[in-house]
Amino acid sequence: MPTSPFIDDLIRDRRTKRGFLDQPVPIEMVKDILSVAKYTPSSSNTQPWRCYVLTGEARERVTTAAVEAYRGAPEGLKPEYSYFPEPLHEPYATRFNSFRGQLGDAEGCCRSDITGRRRYVERQFRFFDAPVGLIFTMDRRLEWASFICYGCFLQNIMLAAKGRGLDTCPQGLWSLQHPVLRTELNLPDDQMVVAGMSLGWADNSMAVNQMSMSRVELEEFTTFVHE
């Protein structure tokens, strides 16, 4: 049976990285990644994605504004869309709590460490020091099918980046920053913020970048129907 070890390895080896080296990414490399990702399939070829690439002064301006907005919102920021149900039910709650526990250990903060948790969120809004920040928007008049297409698009970006030696962190949390992004990027009112993504060269000396989350076995999420 023919296989594609390179593709398989890319999928298995891709990890979310939450700390990056102070090393620039050539803009041509970013263009190459997005030029490959544009071949993502979408429902009836609607291609719902729109991407903003932040580097240099623009990245600094947006991240500074985002951190200031977070610090100035003691009641919390409001997302563009509902992220998780409350309360989160099983089996998802167990998986979520396992991840949060490992992340807290790697970041050196527990769930009760409010200061440490806020410091982590601020790192998110600095793109974890990655030299490239990506912001993704979508026409808010579109429906759920377009979110499915968008997930495929984001995965292709991450795989294309990994194939070039780069790493990424997809960040739904950036949907909380839609007022800042609307101002800083002059987003049209019909565009909703779907997510952000950090892109760069991972700093693998960081404990948080040593995390490796488990996956459930095939039999737990697959039903084979023969008749």
From Swiss-Prot:
It comes from the Bacteria. This is Chloronitrobenzene nitroreductase. FMN binds at residues 14-18, 172-173, 215. Belongs to the nitroreductase family. Pathway: Xenobiotic degradation; nitrobenzene degradation; Xenobiotic degradation; 4-chloronitrobenzene degradation. It catalyses: N-phenylhydroxylamine + 2 NADP(+) + H2O = nitrobenzene + 2 NADPH + 2 H(+). Binds 1 FMN per subunit. It comes from Comamonas testosteroni. Keywords: Aromatic hydrocarbons catabolism, Flavoprotein, FMN, NADP, Nucleotide-binding, Oxidoreductase, Plasmid. Involved in the biodegradation of chlorinated nitroaromatic compounds. Catalyzes the reduction of 4-chloronitrobenzene to yield 1-hydroxylamino-4-chlorobenzene. Probably also able to catalyze the two-electron reduction of nitrobenzene (NB) to produce a nitrosobenzene (NOB) intermediate, which is immediately reduced to hydroxylaminobenzene (HAB) by a second two-electron transfer. Its EC number is 1.7.1.16.
